[in-house]
Amino acid sequence: MVRPSSSSSASASAARSGAAKRKRNLPTATNPTTRASVAANVKGKGKTKALELDLVVSDDGEEDGELDLESDSGDDDANDDDDNDNEQDDFPEIDLEDSDDDQDVEDEDEPGAQEEVDSDNNKQASTQVHDIQVEEDDSSEEGYNSSDIDNSDFDDDADEGDLAYDSADEDERASAFAARSDASQTSIDEELSRMMSRYSSKPDEHSGSLSATNKLGIPRSQAAQAFDLRVRNPDGSAKGVFKRSEITGEMKRVYPEIDAAYDSDSSTEDPENRIGNVPLEWYDDLPHIGYDINGRKVMKPATKDELDKFLDTVDGDGEAWFSARDKSTGKDVRLSDEELAIIRKLQNAEIPDDAYDPYEDYVDWFTGEDKVMQTALSGRPEPKSRFVPSKWEHKKVMKIVRAIREGRIVPGAAANKDAKPKFYNIWADAHENDTRSPWAVMAAPKLALPGHAESYNPPAEYLFNEQEQKEWQEAEAEDRKQNFLPTKHDSLRRVGAYQNFVQERFERCLDLYLAPRMMRKKLDIHNPENLLPKLPSPKELRPFPITTSVVYVHPDGGRVRCLSVDPTGNWLVTGGDDGRARLWDVAIGRCTASWDVCEGMPKAERSAVHSIAWCPTKNYSLFTAVVHGRVAVIAPPQTQNYAKTSANAISSKSASSSSGATATSTASFLYATSAAATSMPSKPDARSPVAWTRPSEAERRTGVAMHLNITSPSAANLKTVVWHNKGDYFATVCPDSAAGSAGLLIHQLSKHRSQSPFRKASKGSSIQKLVFHPTKPWIFVATQRYIRIYDLMAQSLIKTLQSGFKWISTLDVHPSGDHLMVGSYDKKLAWFDLDLSARPYKVLKYHARAIRSVHFSTSWNLVADASDDGTLQLFYAKVGADYGENLTLVPLKVLRGHEVKNGLGVLDVKWHPNQPWLFSAGADGNALLWTT
């Protein structure tokens, strides 16, 4: 074996290194012979370590067929010959494919054979090969695989992109080239020129291999795109354009509209429907499903029926299996891969959270170093049963599944229920509100705890003496206070057997078996004021009377028994104990006239004016006053200027001028006396309980139009007179039980006739008060304990009201006719709702003494009562327009202005017909006007 020289070895090593570099940069050869030769060289790489193999290329591009082994002595001659050849001839052109194939074939034929060739020719061939390869690489756009370069020296799949030489390789090549002793100056200059051109040439910007990355080394496909500075600011924002405003005509800067990307900070990801967490059933009957952030309606999307949903799952693109319905918008939303993964894990009984570690290290709570024994109630590991599907839940689910398969449960049937009909039973679901279970069993009542008498050593006061023991034995079992005899024992062990034990157990069983039980719900009330109804403040219910404005003082301080106000509200008439009726001017409190109702009667028969009532019609101005055995009809001439006259009732005499008119020529007086000439019989009927008589001329000149004398001695004690709303009928009441059918008489003023609606009256029945219904032909008759409602047209009893009072004293009917207020001598006031029940709707007890009078206001929602305790109670009483609205009854104020004399206080009370004013009559001899 010939050993190469050191110079040739160095040059061969440098040439081999450069050849290896260039070989990696060669494009992939399409010639199969080339691939085979390269493979052969790769396989024989281990055998070429001792000798260096260089190929000498001839002028015609073919390789030499012989391999010469040269000694060290022949190197100089060979180098000289090569220098001469380089000076004479140009560097030949090399066919890369032919040279590679020939070399590979020679390597296959003679593996392991190595020959050293002329180093200068080899260097020139290597340089030419490299230049050709650079030209080919510049036009190539393929890359390379770095892993292949690292794994082998020769790679058939090497790419063209590795044009850049490593600086270390360049330095090594330059050192090896300069160390060659046979290198000519020309070859050195050429090599240096190539190296300088390689590093000083401008890279091709359009080359894909050089422009694949930016200055930061980031691929341009992944890096942020550069923006044009002509339309963008340095910070990236868009530049505005100056345009003239169409509204103001001024120049303004207009910016381009921002197109919000998916990852931009915008509101595109906010929910469209902004109604919040409210039941969506509220929008079932509406065309929209909610509202957006601007308040516009979010319309319901088109919904698919069951057939469309089925077709989507069969013929669709498969999205139906990965979609879910969004209740807030009504649309089908495609589930993300993460959400689908969670669903699959839940179906497979897996843990949805990948970050959760189900097999974390066990913590020993009781043993170990630095461990203090402690309870594991709060920190013990979870048992395995909590992570295993429940068998019982599986059974419940399968029960529902079987019911669905059998048709007993229809999914989605609740949404397809028919709408509630227009007319339905409002109490149909009343049983659903009953929270009690039908199978609930009430607990048995507990036995009473034993007392001191049942002790084996009871105190001496519980022991019976002989007399008590004898009485206990003689008494019946149900009359005994206790069913055993107390016995004293020295000790508990001396107590014998109880002989009645079996009997008591048997009776206990009978009680549990037969006795009915009732559950009483105990109210847990911390504040008793919560039980009181929430009433409106009296300040919100104004106006109502609160103060005294006018005092109508009667002479001699006699009691004012009664009073009444004319329909115009300008005049007030009162009746006193002295038997006189007085007319008052409401505004100034002046007494304008006075009449002695008992005039012409014996002194023994004189009495107080018990009742007085003004005719309710505004066509005539007259009133009636009641004394013992007489009813006086008075038409005061002082009030005729305020009365409306009727053309049919006014005669030619009364139609004269007011200067010549007298008390007997007024319209009211003529109306009261018009039927006297035609209806009054020549001889009074002895069987009639009433006699219509003409007053004296002196009385007629004062305005007294007619007297009604009660002929029946038993019915002479008249107490009440009441007018009908039309002003033609009035009724009188005698409360004596001996009056019989004459206790109630109805009189017709226009015909001067009187009659009793009751032909027969039960013995002992006494009528206390009477009022007419405001709109119907009914009368309310109050006895001592009951109120009966009669129909005068049908002559029948309609209803009987049970007051629950011991003695009824007064009553009044509401202007609507559906409510009644009743007062009694036992200090109670009852409100009746005639449409509700025969018993009181409300019972009030605010007075300390008997209630004398009660009255409703016809213009205001006010009611007042008078009592013997000297006070008046005001109430706000509002009645609902329909039957579903409850009564509102609110106490307003207590009026105190009358003195109590001889046990009597306020005797009568009346409301002003138009104003919220109140008139009261007291036993102190005064009548008061209460105003706001």
Curated annotation (Swiss-Prot):
Any one Gene Ontology BP term: maturation of 5.8S rRNA from tricistronic rRNA transcript (SSU-rRNA, 5.8S rRNA, LSU-rRNA)
Subcellular location: Nucleus, Nucleolus; Nucleus, Nucleoplasm
Family per record: Belongs to the WD repeat BOP1/ERB1 family.
Lineage: Eukaryota, Fungi, Dikarya, Basidiomycota, Ustilaginomycotina
Keyword Protein biosynthesis: no
InterPro entries: BOP1/Erb1, BOP1_N_dom, WD40/YVTN_repeat-like_dom_sf, WD40_repeat_CS, WD40_repeat_dom_sf, WD40_rpt
This protein's record includes keyword Nucleus: yes
Name of the molecule in the record: Ribosome biogenesis protein ERB1
